[in-house]
Structure formats: C-alpha cells, structure tokens
C-alpha cells in the first residue's frame, strides 16, 4: 500500500480497478480542514490523463509494473511495432494508447514497454530525446526583445518553440515530459 502523501512522478498504483501512473502531485491544506492531494495521473490502460483528489493519509494499492527494454521498429498507422532487444520478439501497441509518445518516436529508439500481469499497457520514453529539425523559418531581425523563439517542426511532425539560432537540419534535445526544447544536440 502507498500513502497518497508519498506520491511522486512515476509512481504506479491501482485505484477503482484501473492502473495509474502519477504525472504530478500537489499537496494542500486548508485552514482547519484535512490536507488533500491533487494528483495528475495517466490511466495506463486507456491513456487518459485526469486529475484525482485524495484526502491526506488515504492509501492506494501499489501496482507492480514490469518494464521491458525494447526498440521501436515502425508505425503502421494503427499501431506501433516494438522489438525485444534480447529475444527479438515483436509486440504491437495501438496508437490510441500512446498518442503523446508518438510525437517522439523515431526508428531504432530504445523505450520501455510497461506490462501488468502480462497485459501490455503502454511505453515509457527516455526523459530527453535527440530529434532533427526538418523545417523552421529564419529569425526576423529586431524581433529580439526577451527570450525570442520561433516554431520548428521535428522529424516526427511535432512542432516546438526553439531559440532563434537553431537552423533547419540541426539536431536538438527535447523533453518527452512536456515536449519542450532543452538544448542543442
């Protein structure tokens, strides 16, 4: 059992016959009232992200998730295909379960497949990924008041804001948690 006061990003738990992973947790206490915990959680079966409120001290069942190292092979439009690095076994996961993760998948990238009692749930990406910029426009002179950025399209089709000095064809490091530019590769 896990006390909800110990919620941290990445903790997995069972609640109301569903399996969740904590994305973020905020603890609050009002005056004389009981403390509560607002947790932004992702349902690992459906991929839905919701906010759940728990009263302080409440306990939930820990979900023991098996993580298997795999390589991304390809996306056929309906599902992605992964290959186990040790057994060469291939596994397909529906795109509807991993809509956010699709923004960062490139051929050969290493991911972790999450399983619960032999049920395939979803994938876990590395915290930061190197991706190539396929298109961006040149900076406009004089548009440099405070921390100027411009839109850029990555090789996966995902769009991010990058600093003005980044050019088309360069590689950048992107955070997979919030989808933002981190640094030049």
From Swiss-Prot:
<dbReference type="InterPro" id="IPR011768">
    <property type="entry name" value="Transl_elongation_fac_P"/>
</dbReference>
<dbReference type="InterPro" id="IPR014722">
    <property type="entry name" value="Rib_uL2_dom2"/>
</dbReference>
<dbReference type="GO" id="GO:0003746">
    <property type="term" value="F:translation elongation factor activity"/>
</dbReference>
<dbReference type="InterPro" id="IPR013185">
    <property type="entry name" value="Transl_elong_KOW-like"/>
</dbReference>
<protein>
    <recommendedName>
        <fullName>Elongation factor P</fullName>
    </recommendedName>
</protein>
<keyword id="KW-0251">Elongation factor</keyword>
<comment type="function">
    <text>Involved in peptide bond synthesis. Stimulates efficient translation and peptide-bond synthesis on native or reconstituted 70S ribosomes in vitro. Probably functions indirectly by altering the affinity of the ribosome for aminoacyl-tRNA, thus increasing their reactivity as acceptors for peptidyl transferase.</text>
</comment>
<dbReference type="GO" id="GO:0043043">
    <property type="term" value="P:peptide biosynthetic process"/>
</dbReference>
<dbReference type="InterPro" id="IPR013852">
    <property type="entry name" value="Transl_elong_P/YeiP_CS"/>
</dbReference>
<dbReference type="GO" id="GO:0005737">
    <property type="term" value="C:cytoplasm"/>
</dbReference>
<comment type="similarity">
    <text>Belongs to the elongation factor P family.</text>
</comment>
<keyword id="KW-0963">Cytoplasm</keyword>
<dbReference type="InterPro" id="IPR001059">
    <property type="entry name" value="Transl_elong_P/YeiP_cen"/>
</dbReference>
<dbReference type="InterPro" id="IPR020599">
    <property type="entry name" value="Transl_elong_fac_P/YeiP"/>
</dbReference>
<dbReference type="Pfam" id="PF08207">
    <property type="entry name" value="EFP_N"/>
</dbReference>
<dbReference type="InterPro" id="IPR008991">
    <property type="entry name" value="Translation_prot_SH3-like_sf"/>
</dbReference>
<dbReference type="Pfam" id="PF01132">
    <property type="entry name" value="EFP"/>
</dbReference>
<dbReference type="InterPro" id="IPR015365">
    <property type="entry name" value="Elong-fact-P_C"/>
</dbReference>
<dbReference type="Pfam" id="PF09285">
    <property type="entry name" value="Elong-fact-P_C"/>
</dbReference>
<keyword id="KW-0648">Protein biosynthesis</keyword>
<comment type="pathway">
    <text>Protein biosynthesis; polypeptide chain elongation.</text>
</comment>
<dbReference type="InterPro" id="IPR012340">
    <property type="entry name" value="NA-bd_OB-fold"/>
</dbReference>
